[in-house]
Amino acid sequence: MFEVKNSRGYIQGLFDSIIRKDIQQRFKIRYIESLRMLANHMIDNFGQEIIYSDLAERFGFGSSHTAENYVSYLKQTYLLLGIHKFSFKSKERIRNEKSYVVDTAFITERDDAMNGQNIGWKLENITYVELLRRNKPLFYDVFYYREQYEIDFVVCEGN
């Protein structure tokens, strides 16, 4: 392990590199500032259900399909992780996706960080990442289950 003297600068540099090199260059994104604002918004609002039409309207994308693509790019570069709601109905599983942040340092150490103080949300994020780390290699699926204000996770084997 090595010690980073300026953790905020390091994390911000990593974030900028993911946006510019891993996403903009790879996917030929023209509106980089919109992507950056979306990425910051998704990190600040981790653990919330994703509504692509709202994102498209908020960031001025031409369609919800564009917002969905941009969020997909953030997941493909491992900045965000997606999770679906547990339901026996496939339509509900697909429709109600949430996102979490791969590394909680992005929540607290970015220059535009807004949501670093809510310890409950950070613990929920850490719990999901750890469940995924432990169960994905075993081909288990992890879902979220919401009952009023409580968020629980469900781990399922196979289908």
Where do the PLM segments sit?
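Accessory nucleic acid-recognition modules appended to NTPase machines
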Residues: 2-158
